[in-house]
Structures are given as C-alpha cells and as structure tokens.
Amino acid sequence: MASSAREHLLFVRRRNPQMRYTLSPENLQSLAAQNSMPENMALQRANSDTDLVTSESRSSLTASMYEYTLGQAQNLIIFWDIKEEVDPSDWIGLYHIDENSPANFWDSKNRGVTGTQKGQIVWRIEPGPYFMEPEIKICFKYYHGISGALRATTPCITVKNPAVMMGAEGMEGGASGSLHSRKLVSFTLSDLRAVGLKKGMFFNPDPYLKMSIQPGKKSSFPTCAHHGQERRSTIISNTTNPIWHREKYSFFALLTDVLEIEIKDKFAKSRPIIKRFLGKLTIPVQRLLERQAGDQMLSYNLGRRLPADHVSGYLQFKVEVTSSAHEDASPEAVGTILGVHTVNGDLGSPSDEEDMPGSHHDSTICANGPVSEDSVADGTPKHSFRTSSTLEIDTEDLISTSSRNSPPRGRQDSLNDYLDAIEHNGPARPGAASSSERSMGASPKLRSSFPTDTRLNAMLHIDSDEEDHEFQQDLGYPSSLEEEGGLIMCSRASRIDDGSLTSQTKPEDDNPVENEDASIHETASLEERLENLPEVADGSLPSSTAPDENEANLEPQPSADQGSTELCSSQEVDQPTSGADAGASDTSGGSRRAASETESLDQGSEPSQVSSETEPSDPARTESVSEASTRPEGESDPEGADSSCNESVTTQLSSVETRCSSLESARFPETPAFSSQEEEDGACAAEPTSSGPAEGSQESVCTPSSLPAVQVPSREEEGSAAEAAALSEQGELGEVWQRRGSLEGAAAAAPAAAATDSQPQEDGDAGDAQGACEGATAQEEGATGGSQTNGHQPLRSLPSVRQDVSRYQRVDEALPPNWEARIDSHGRIFYVDHVNRTTTWQRPTAPPAPQVLQRSNSIQQMEQLNRRYQSIRRTMTNERPEENTSAIDGAGEEADFHQASADFRRENVLPHSTSRSRLTLLLQSPPVKFLISPEFFTVLHSNPSAYRMFTNNTCLKHMITKVRRDTHHFERYQHNRDLVGFLNMFANKQLELPRGWEMKHDHQGKAFFVDHNSRTTTFIDPRLPLQSSRPTSALVHRQHLTRQRSHSAGEVGEDSRHAGPPVLPRPSSTFNTVSRPQYQDMVPVAYNDKIVAFLRQPNILEILQERQPDLARNHSLREKIQFIRTEGTPGLVRLSSDADLVMLLSLFEEEIMSYVPPHALLHPSYCQSPRGSPVSSPQNSPGTQRANARAPAPYKRDFEAKLRNFYRKLETKGYGQGPGKLKLIIRRDHLLEDAFNQIMGYSRKDLQRNKLYVTFVGEEGLDYSGPSREFFFLVSRELFNPYYGLFEYSANDTYTVQISPMSAFVDNHHEWFRFSGRILGLALIHQYLLDAFFTRPFYKALLRILCDLSDLEYLDEEFHQSLQWMKDNDIHDILDLTFTVNEEVFGQITERELKPGGANIPVTEKNKKEYIERMVKWRIERGVVQQTESLVRGFYEVVDARLVSVFDARELELVIAGTAEIDLNDWRNNTEYRGGYHDNHIVIRWFWAAVERFNNEQRLRLLQFVTGTSSIPYEGFASLRGSNGPRRFCVEKWGKITALPRAHTCFNRLDLPPYPSFSMLYEKLLTAVEETSTFGLE
C-alpha cells in the first residue's frame, strides 16, 4: 500500500547527475536500506558535499538529524554555510528526495534582509498532505534568490509518520477502477486581457502570451501527438494592462491535460530587463471547461515559479467549447470527469508563490483535508463541526466559487498524483449534483517572507511567531493542531440561478439533523482519521441531502479525543451538508481556527491568489481577501492554506446579502484587488469582483493577496457614505460570517456562531484585528487580521513591528484617496501619496483642493518633490520674526527660534495641528529657554550643587547636550527625574509664576506645574533664570556652545543654524561690559579661528588655570586643548560638543573675542571670514542671517586647494571634455526611466570622457548648462526619493536619506544603485550639484572609509546612545553581554556571532572597545552591504577613486551637494545689473525687499528658477557657474510690466520688467518662481 500511495504521490524522477553537493538517490536509498546497521553509522557518512576532501571550500546545508518522527518534541534544525554570494531573496526549500524541479517544493522559507553566509533555523515539519506514508524521504535545498542557482543540499532525511497505519489500503481499491476519457475536446480562448502586471521600477512591460497544452502530470496519463501545441499572442507595447483584441486561440486537448499560459515581457535591448517572466497559469482543461458558461469572463490570478519571483495581476479570458467529449464517455467516467473538479479551489489560479517551469503540470487538489468515504455517503463530513446553514444551494455558483479558489501551484504538483488518486477513487454517486460536490483536501503550507510588490517593499520583517504561539496557548488551542488546517473557511452566500440547476437539487430533506448528529457523535481516534484520509472520494452531495430551509445547531461532543477532532476538523472543508454550513458559523472550528487566521505580521506567506470570475453587471458582489493563519514559532505558514479558501455554501434568504467580513467589500465594487505587503502587514485589501445581478450575494473569500496596490479608483470614493451603507446592511444580514481574525473574541464567538439572525457589529470589531474598515492605521498588538481599507481604496496597512504597534493610537478618520500610512524602520509614521509618488510626515486630512491655476506636470512634480523632503530647510532660518513670533505673548523675538524645521514644513500647504502647536509652545517653555541660553554654563558655574550633579551624571550631561543641540529632544527628556531635579535647583521660589502657569499638588503633596499655554503638566518649576527678552543679535550666539552640524550629520534643525560654520560671537551685550557692535568690522575673524588662535598662545595653560584651577588635575581636558592647538579648527570642530571644553571656553568668552593674533596684520587672509564663516551685522533681521551650511566648512584654504587641484586633474585627464557628447534626451514625465535607460546604456569610457548635453523633450532650449543643472536637480530629487524604496529617511531627521535595507526587495535593485552611483559621479565631474541630502556614513562609504561610533548616531540615535554610554562608563558587573546580536533570518529570530565563538565571549571592560567596533560595523552594514557596493561601483565607473580620495567625508559632501545656504548679503554683493538697473534703483530695492520677505523655501525656488539649481557652490555666489565658466547672478531690465519675470538658466540671468509698484513686483515674482518650469528659445 505504501508503495502504491507513493506512486500516486509522485512519479519518481531520476535526479540530475549535475546537481551539486547532493548524494545520488541510489546512494541515499542504499543508506536508508541498511536497517540492520546501527543508526549512527549511517549518520557518519551523511554529508551534503560529495567532495569530502575539500568540503571546507564548498557550501553546505546540513540538518541536526536525519531521521525525524512527526510529532516528536525535538526540533529539526537546518544549518547552512554558504561560500558563494548570498542575497536577501535566497530561500531554502523542502523537497521530496527525488524532486529535480526547484519549483516543486513542499515548503520554503525566504532569508530576508538580514542573515549571513552561515546560520541555522528551526524547521518544524507537521503531519500534512505530503506525509501520508509511514516513511517519506526528503531533503532541503538552498537556492540563490537572484540567479536561482542551487547552493547546497542536505543529505536524505527520513520522515516517519507513526499515525499512518502501514496497512492502509483505502486508495488502492478505487484507483484501479478509474477510467479516463480519451476523446479530444476542442476549445477556443478569446477576449484575453491581463490586469495589473508587474512593472519595473519605472518601465511598463511589453507583454505577450505563450500558451501550450501539456499532458497531465500523472504518470498514467499518456503523452499524445497533440501535446506541445503552442500559441503566441501579439506583443502589446508599454502597458501593465494589455488587451489582446480580436485574437482567438484554439486548442485540442484531453480532459486530463493542462493548459499552460505564461506572460512574458518582450526582450528589449534598449532597457535592462533582468527577468522577463511576468506570471503564469497552469489550468487543468477539465476545470477550464467546467467554468466556461456562455459569455462570462474567467479571471485567474497569476502565479509565480519560485519564491524569489515577483508577480502581480490577473488574467481574464473567455472560453468557448467547440466540441465536447462527454457524450461518448461512460456515465461513470463522466461522473468522475466532472466530479473531480468540484474539489475546493481552481488549479487555474496558481498561487503567487509558485509559477511553475514548463514541464510540470497539475491535476486537481483537495483543499482542506480529506473527509472519509462513509461520511460522504451520509452527505455529511465525518468530523463535522457545529454548523448552521439554511436554504437552497445554487450549484452553478458552487462551481464558480469553487473555482475561484486557487490551490498552490508548484509545491502541490508533486502532490497531484496522490490527489488524482483521491479524485478517481470514490465511485461517483448516480444522481449526484456533481457541480456542488466538495472534496476535502489538505493544503500544503509555506512561509515566505518575500514581498512581491515591486515598488514599495520597504518595510519590516520582524518575526512574530512567538506572540502568535502565545495567543494560541491563551485560547487553549494546541499549536500543532492549529497548523493542520491549511485553509480558511469562508462562507459564501450563493445567489439562486434557476436556469442552471433546477434538476440537480432536491428542494428538501427532512433528515439533516439526524445525519449530522450521527456524524458528530462519532469519536474516531486520530489514527483512524489519518488512516482514512486517503479514502476520501469527491464527496458528491447526493440529491437526497439537498439542504432544507432549516437550521441545525449541533454541538460537538466533548471528549478525550478533542485534540484529534480539532486536527481533523481544521483540515476539513465546510461541506454543504444537510442543513449545515460549516463555514458560516463553525463554532468549534471557528474557535479552534480563530487564532490561526491572522497572518503573522511579516511572515509574508505568499498566498495563492483567489481567482475570480467577473460579471460586470453586478457591482455589489465582491470578494474580500482573507486573513492567513498565525502559527507558533518556526512553523510554515499555510501557503496553500491562504490560497484556496473553501467556500461553504451558505445560501441566502431571498435577496439578503451575506455579511462581508469587512466593510470594504461593499465599498469597492469595481476595483480589481491588488493588496500588497501582506508579508509585512498581515493586512488584506478587498478583492472585489463584480458578478451577478445587483441583488447578488457578496462573498468573503479572505486570503492575503500579494499584489501591488495599483488600485482602480472606486465609484464609491465617498468613504463615509459607503461605510454607512455597509453598516446599515449589517443589521439585515441573515447569515453572519464569523471573522476569524479575532484573537480576543474567538472564544467568545463560539456560542453565538450558529445564529442566523443579524449579529451586532462588535462581532466584526472583536474579530477584526485591524478594527473597523475605516482607514485604520493602527494595528492591535498581537493580531493583524482582516481586510483593511481607509474608506477610499484598499491601501497597504501599516507594516508595523508588532512589538511597537501599541505606541500608535488608532486613527479612525479615513485618509484621502490614494494615500497610505506606513511606519518606517525607526518606528515613525509617514504617509505615502501613490498618485504623486511622494511621502510626507504630515497626515493628509482631506483630499487636496483643486488647483486654481492649471499647472504643468513638471511644476506639479517640482512642488511634490519639494514637499517630499518636507521643505528641506537648507537655509534653516525661519521666516521673519513678525510672521512667526506674534502668536506667543511675551516671547519676544526669540519665540520660535528654536523650532525645528518639522514644525514649519509645508507652512503654506497645511495648517498646524493642535499637537504641533502644543509642541511649539512646549519648546518655548522656560526650561527650554534656560537650557539653550548662552548664559547657561555661566549660571551653572554659579550653582555648586547643580554643577556637581552635572559633572557627575553622564546621562544628565548627555540630555542637556542633546537639548542644546536640538530643542526637540526636550519633549523626550522633559519628565526625566534627573533633569527635573537638576532644573529645579535653579528655580527661584520667591518669584511669581509666569503668565499662564499654575502650581498644584498631587495626592502625595508634591508640587507640579500646569502650563495652560501648551496644556501640559510638568514637575519642572518654570521660575528659572534667563527668561528676560534679549536683543535679536543674541539669537545667533550659540555656535561655540554646540557641535558643528551638517546635513550629512542629520543635525539640521531650526536651532542648528546657530551651530554651523562660525556665525556670530556671543554679543557682548550679554556681558556687563561695553558693547562692541562694530567689532566684526574691525577684526573679521571667524569665531572658531579666534578660539584656536587664543588657545595657541604659548602660556595658555597658565591663563586657563587662573580661572579653572581644576584644569591642572584634569588631564583629559588638557589633552583636548593640546589637540586643538595641534589640529586647529578641524580639531575644535570634532570637540565642539564636549561639555567640559565648552564650559571652560565660556569662562573666557571676553578674552577670546578680544584676542587678536599678533600675525593677523601680516596675513590679511587669516582675518577674512571664510565662505563657511559668514559675518553679518547683529542689526540684520533674523530672516537675513546666514543659515547653517550643509556641513561645517573645513579649513578653507586647504579645501579650496584640494578642490582646485581636483578639477585641474579632471581636466588634464580629459574627464567630461569631449569631443564626443553624452546626449540625454529626457521626457519630464519619464525622467528616471529615460535617464536610467540612457545613462546605463553608455560605456564607462563614454561616461568619463564625453561632454554632457541634456535636452528636455518638447523644450527647444539649448543646453548651455541650464538644462543639465535642472536635470541633476530633478533626477536627484526623484532618485533618492524614499517612495521608490531604494533609500529611506535617516533616523535623526525628515530629509537626509540613506540606503534602505528593504531595497533588497526592489526589482533590479543592484542596477538601480549602480545608476545612482553613476549619477553621483557625473554630477561630480561635470561640476553640478545634487539636490540630495545623505548621512555621513554614506559619504564615508563612497570614499571606502570605515565608520566609527560617531557615525552611528545618524543611523540610529538610541543605539548610538547606548553604545556611547557603554564606552563612557565602567560596565564591570553591570551588563551581561556576549559578542552576539539577534537577527531575523528565514522568518525566525536567530543569534549571530560578531566574531567566531562570540556566543561564549562575555563583554568586559577590557574588550568592550572591540565589541563596540563590531556592533557599529554590524549596525551600519546591516542589510545594505551589497547595495552599497553596487552604488560605489557605479560611482567609480565614472570617477577615478584616486582623484576622489583626497577628500574626507565632509569635504566630499560639499563637493557633491554644495552648502545650499542662502546668505542674502553674499547674494546681493555678487549680483550684476544690466539694462539700466543698478543697486540703488527703486525696482532693485523692491526686488531685494521681496526676496527678504520670501521664506526660505521661496528663496531656494527663486534661485532654482534663475540658475537651474537651488544649491550654490562652496565658495558662495561669487562662484556661480554659467554655460562657459563662472557667471554671477544677474538682473536685467527687460520685458513688459504685464509679463512675468523670465529666467535664463544658462546665464544665471533674471529678466525683470520695471514694475510700477512693490506689490506688483512681489506678486509677479512669486508667481514666476512658483508656477513656471520649462525651457524655451527666444
């Protein structure tokens, strides 16, 4: 029997002798046959490498044991050691030992973005459809995701199933009797169309179809002459939704054959297509003929071949049978032929998981677990659970809904022979309604954490199995049983179609209750049930058991065998038994399965897509996608489980519609379902398919879909109205679909499950882990079930990390259409606009108002790109004080000066939210003002107890340093006990409380303070010193107190404009000395230079010790002073955040300011303010103050020399000199696509040598550098846009970006990073600046410089803080650490050693430095090593590494991105005038007044409008470049006063008409800057 079953399970193929590292089957069988030998002797020879001599150089895959018994407690552990290249898309598959095809895996796991070349995971094997024999031999194989190459294979592993009785003969008896029709059938496919095909990052495919007829997979099916028929469609250009008009394809086939359809992308030399495969269907001809019904359109979701494939979309077509084989076949054969296909799920909708190679076909598959023959004979499943179902069954609908569900293709192929045997075993019952038969089958399970979305695979893969396991235990389910089910049972109310089946269903049967009682009270043991599994026949529903309009509420009998009952029932399909519908209200099943419904957050089981027939006439009938199952740790997700949902036939009372599990099903009647990211989100989008008349039922077929969210807008975009309608429907529903996503409500749901009356909405709320269907952006911890939508369109739900989701409050208000909320890898919520392809940190509250002006696509794009980085504040100065500070009483000019840019981003677009205003007020509170005051350290010195606390408490020092650097940190630290105690030491209890403050006492008598201004409470006493208003000039004081900051350092906040390259010395007015307003004019020395000069005095230590006697004993501080004396300004920059040094220097403020170096007069250049050290008068308004630079300027003369030398060498080596041209013809609306195609098409030599020439299509302007500059501006804003998934925002701010670990899941990502590197290189050699902001480690990576601990702060601030604390403190007996880190690999949290044997090496005070270095390396490189290598490779394809190596990271940042700060004085001083204008002309004065009134973003846009880029060179406006070298900003008197100003970007010239009034000039200039963006010829 076992061998017979084995024969039906799969036909044995000989293994490919070229398969690497694998023992041959003969050897493996001989090893297994040596039963007489001791077991360990066989194990000694087990090795995955046939070359035992040099195995160290080969990849290996091994297992912890080679005999595994199902159900045993011991885990099977798989170890890998891969010597070749690895990739995040690598996967390990479980195969039968004789399987050669990579696609025929039984289970698989994807690696994910972390993981290394060595590791291990636990693999739990459960009794299932593949292990129906006493012994089965399997192996595991490791495949490289990108190339598909087999890396390693385990030796043979024998899996024993003690539950299967050796003598089971159920299959044999029936199998021999099956007859197959040998008559050919002719059919025609027409009206073929595909919807939502996968596209490249920016390219639409050119799809075509390959169709062929192949023999059925079973070995008994013959290969005939007609096999191999192949048809090819025409190629449809540039579309993801091809329609093959007027094309028909005819085929001849046996009923046992399969039709294979593959969609491919036409090969195009002009663009790099790495994978041309777009999706595949393998449809049994029988199923196809069953589903064809007149003119109705069949719809099948496309499947994939391997877990690493990216597939989306579905295929639709009509089938017309031109000649049928049925009349010549015997009745028995016809019954078998037709009956076989009512098995749950249509093979034609292959799982997204498995698009099969051409040689593998499938037959039918059972879905949930077989039901024994005797129970079928009664018309009830043997292990029924409590059900309630009423009404007549629409058999035709059974066919359609049955075929909607797609079992997994591929891994089920090797199962198909077994299933075929099942199908043909049971004799077809005469008179049976074959179209309503429901055969039960087990469904294979897979876990795949591989996202298939091609554009936004950007989120987290955190394993949540442990929590799922806990939920199951909490609910009292044995976790092992939870796995068995495989399928989610969905109820479906079928509409009655009298014409289709009247003769096949008997209207009544009075015995359903007795039948079911009998079946339910059977308590067969687990072994009996497993033994009976193979005996399942098709389960025809006899006409004698057609359901009556009665209700049967049957309680399963509790018994000691409850566990086994659960096992089997979870495998059962809800059979349309007499009066009972298990799917509608399966209480025992429902409660048992509830916990297993919710897809673990990031597992990402790749579901088989639910194929859908669409009849456009019915807008109400929809499908929604179901939750998948949650499993205990290490378990495979039921891929098949998710894929083929059983529909129980729940018929309907008149036109009452079955309640959809979530409201969105009613909401999106037209949208083809493309949800995405179920891997990360566990969320499901609706899959609506209209079909049937308007009264038709809705069905809830729930399975996470993995298609990209390319949504067709719904007619019902008014979410609230649709929701109200859906809610009102809820009360009238006759059939309740129990949401199994329920974790909390699962147990409670059981008693009420049988109700056929209306059920309250809370049933959905309890069951729906996402909450209601409104745009739920929060997910409840522990569950992410259910479909989710935001009321407008199915969007991806928050890909949240389960541990963190509780931090985000639930948001019930729907997002506007085409918006989606997400959480980035730092736990911050951001919003994605899918229409404009932008991201924003602010929640969009309503659909945008229609534009008043009709803007061109390019200007809309420019504005969106500007918003994408949240109004990048490179000029970090706020608007004029009167605009910003008037809102707060008594705040003086300083009110908003410490606001971070985030508070004012998009100030002209959206109003501030209440929380934002509250934050604004908080940041202006007395504690913040005190901490950031320039006098803070002076006051600190005068308070000995506070000073002692400050110096002794490193945490306190760290917090104060952070707050002084960026006031936003105060919100985080404000309730810290140390900080509160410290600040209260300065409070003056005698003073009145500030206005709006009130003191209260808690129940313990402790005083606390209420700030009614910001509606906050605090223990910090607001009566702190330094609250008096100060002159405006004081606001630019703090450069010497805080660290030098840069964009790459991720530190540019509003407050950071004080911290840039030296701004202004602290005004002397803050000291009680004579004011020196003209001091800067007399000695224009940058403040840092003054400090260095002061410290370089010969007797400096004596001078310092006079005021700071402790200096003599503080060797560390003395070393720092010596370091600054030696290194100069760069050394001071490095130490600028050192609190001890800052305090020391603050004592000598006056001396430093008054100190004039003796050689200053001899070297005038020493006294000149460098470009990075602007000097402006304290009388200037804050709006005109020089803002922070992107990076602190290095020592100017040295850097300028490097830069000149660099460009000179580029010129001598012929970089970018021609004579050839690098012609780029760019369409604005296809900017990246055109740029990628053309730049990647050039050779390395062409890129280096040729002169760049950019033309925008439709704009006849010549490129005298203006279009080139704009090209780099636009391409950098698009390419580094986090929307596309290549880059992500850094941890510290909302606009600097870094390489995203999730970019590994973007199609062709290595080529895109190469392209990014080439763009960086081209910008460098052609001397253009990029409008992009990167973190410091990015520039270090470009220079191949190792990162250190300080660089980590820009990636992960808290992680850096922890390591910094560890570095600064003695960790002896405090921390219990080893040289290991935890990573998620193949869906499991695994421990990775930072060094060999690291798990056994404790971290001590002696080796902590090495530990910190290794942790920094691991954290910075985590998930981005290969991407970084690709980018660096592209960069050095354009630029010689030796040329760039002269720069450090900070200098390279300046060369690539410029300082992009606007100094109005510098701008005005370096502007030329023509046509009669001069500096004192009234129009010019108005012009500069208008520029001064502009906010920072508008100034940048003006600069971009005139010069083509909003960045300016390091040297300032004097070094602006035009078409043929340096060309200053120019304003020319030209044009009519009715016209707008005009720009000539090639010459940096603005044509400004002589407007008669300031208001007209301001309005026209603003309009020109914000509304225009094209090039033209005069």
Swiss-Prot record:
In which residue ranges is the amino acid composition biased (Low complexity)? 577-593, 721-735, 746-755, 769-782
Keyword Translocase among record annotations = no
Pfam families with a match to the protein in the record: C2, HECT, HECW1_helix, HECW_N, WW
The record's listing under InterPro entries reads:
C2_dom, C2_domain_sf, C2_HECW, E3_ubiq-protein_ligase, HECT_dom, Hect_E3_ubiquitin_ligase, HECW1_helix, HECW_N
Residue ranges annotated as compositionally biased, kind Basic residues, are: 1037-1046
Enzymatic reactions: S-ubiquitinyl-[E2 ubiquitin-conjugating enzyme]-L-cysteine + [acceptor protein]-L-lysine = [E2 ubiquitin-conjugating enzyme]-L-cysteine + N(6)-ubiquitinyl-[acceptor protein]-L-lysine
One MF term in GO for this entry?
A: ubiquitin-protein transferase activity
Name the domain of life: Eukaryota
Q: In which pathway does it act?
A: Protein modification; protein ubiquitination
What does UniProt give as GO cellular component? cytoplasm; mitotic spindle
Q: Where in the numbering of this chain does the HECT domain appear?
A: 1243-1578
Tell me the active site: 1546
SMART domains per UniProt: C2, HECTc, WW
Tell me, in one coarse class, where this protein mainly resides.
cytoplasm
Provide ranges: composition bias, Basic and acidic residues.
518-532
Span of domain WW: 813-846, 991-1024
Gene3D superfamilies in UniProt: 2.20.70.10, 2.60.40.2840, C2 domain (2.60.40.150), Hect, E3 ligase catalytic domain (3.30.2410.10), Hect, E3 ligase catalytic domains (3.90.1750.10)
Which region ranges are annotated with the description Disordered?
341-453, 496-802, 1030-1075, 1167-1193
PANTHER family (alphabetical): E3 UBIQUITIN-PROTEIN LIGASE HECW2, HECT DOMAIN UBIQUITIN-PROTEIN LIGASE
Q: What's the protein here called?
A: E3 ubiquitin-protein ligase HECW2
What is the protein's species of origin?
A: Mus musculus
The gene coding this protein: Hecw2
